[in-house]
């Protein structure tokens, strides 16, 4: 074998060992010369290896062969691997062949596949990978923080939505209750009022009139007498049926004096007195006490040929003038089926009670209680409503237009002026000489703004209407005015406007006699004092 410096020593020793003939019993070439065989491993390790490789370890020899790329050949017979420990072991390499020693230069020892340059390249790649991973991590953290912010905002938005839904539901419930309350009032045809009883007019056929508080004056004490004409043509103006109002006179004299009072017949049509008499005696309704109800004459309209006694009481002498309690009935008309006498008593008693001190305090207390009850009802009461009522409420064809309200106001003014032109019975001579009752008091009842508000009329309209009526009656003495002109003068009233009046409970200092009479514009005069008279 040619020695070559490029061939490793192990390969040279192995080639010599296989080529020598005295070692053929331990190691030799195979039959095809492509590999070599180790026949007896134990004897080869003990006898041959120490001579060539300075050791007798067969495993170390096999490891060296593997380092140079030799492979162990496995024999397969009938699919079974033969494993004989003492049998021959064959090793093969592509460049280790019999008779071709020049191929030994191609056999190289296996070295590590890692190189410094490759390690540097891998380190750079690793650095890039780590940097990219860090960037991804930063982006992930940013995304996570943004996601957490979005979650918090979403939670706050959902909370706000839930709160708004709750508020909306509460508002819907409040609106539903308000609508139920309004529809309940419309269904029952009831309005929240201050529980003030409004008297009914006895007349059921006349037009509706405004509620005006008349000026009640004391009768004159002179000896001038007025006689009522018995004929329909004397002192009357020809006109058709104007009104069916009733003037009720209370007999305030003794029974003996009542017999001397003349009976004046009343027919179905109204009687209009002379304008000169109307100016001196405005519309007066004299109310009788309860103990004298049996002597009170009642005049009913609509019945023909039924006489009734009417009189006015006056003072017998100049020392004690007559003081008569006169109250004007409210002019609101309404249909009723009650007895006129019973209804008259209740109305008169209702008006008289408003003039008392204790009754007025009770009346103001009832107003406060009504307001508190109304507030409690609005705050705590539950209302039930039929759903069909909502359709009827908003699609109702029965609605009052402002023009209808103005027409009603005009009709009320017509009724008021007609009442002013109705017959006023003059005081007879016998009535002026009769005795006066000590329990009667003549009171000048002027327009009260609070009560006018409760009656549905503003104070300005009440005072204006009262002043206009008085001036028209006083001016009729000098110049007669036709009934048509008097009616036309009241056809353009101002529309009624609602005004809010705040009621406060009275203290003990405010509930004194002078304060209460000042509030009601009543003069707390004694029974025997003289009242100022209006200019007749």
Curated annotation (Swiss-Prot):
GO CC, one annotated term: cytoplasm
Residue span of region Disordered: 300-337, 407-438
Residues covered by region (Hydrophobic repeat HR-A/B): 119-192
Role: DNA-binding protein that specifically binds heat shock promoter elements (HSE) and activates transcription. In higher eukaryotes, HSF is unable to bind to the HSE unless the cells are heat shocked.
Self-association state and partner proteins as the record states: DNA-binding homotrimer in stressed or heat shocked cells, otherwise found as a homodimer.
Localization: Cytoplasm; Nucleus
Residues spanning the membrane: none
A GO biological process held by the record: spermatogenesis
Chain residue numbers at which the record places covalent cross-link Glycyl lysine isopeptide (Lys-Gly) (interchain with G-Cter in SUMO2): 2, 82, 135, 139, 151, 210, 218, 237
Family: Belongs to the HSF family.
Region described as Hydrophobic repeat HR-C: 360-385
Taxonomic superkingdom: Eukaryota
Stretches with biased composition (Low complexity): 311-325
One of the Pfam families matching this protein, by short name: Vert_HS_TF
Protein's UniProt name: Heat shock factor protein 2
Alphabetical list of PANTHER family matching this protein: HEAT SHOCK FACTOR PROTEIN 2 (PTHR10015:SF185), HEAT SHOCK TRANSCRIPTION FACTOR (PTHR10015)
DNA-binding region: 7-112
Gene Ontology MF terms in the entry: DNA-binding transcription activator activity, RNA polymerase II-specific; DNA-binding transcription factor activity, RNA polymerase II-specific; identical protein binding; RNA polymerase II cis-regulatory region sequence-specific DNA binding; RNA polymerase II intronic transcription regulatory region sequence-specific DNA binding; RNA polymerase II transcription regulatory region sequence-specific DNA binding; sequence-specific double-stranded DNA binding
UniProt cross-references to PROSITE patterns, sorted A to Z: HSF_DOMAIN (PS00434)
Matches recorded under InterPro entries: HSF_DNA-bd, Vert_HSTF_C, WH-like_DNA-bd_sf, WH_DNA-bd_sf
Biased composition annotated in UniProt, kind: Polar residues: 326-337
Location of the motif Nuclear localization signal: 108-122, 195-210
Keywords, alphabetical: Activator, Cytoplasm, DNA-binding, Isopeptide bond, Nucleus, Stress response, Transcription, Transcription regulation, Ubl conjugation
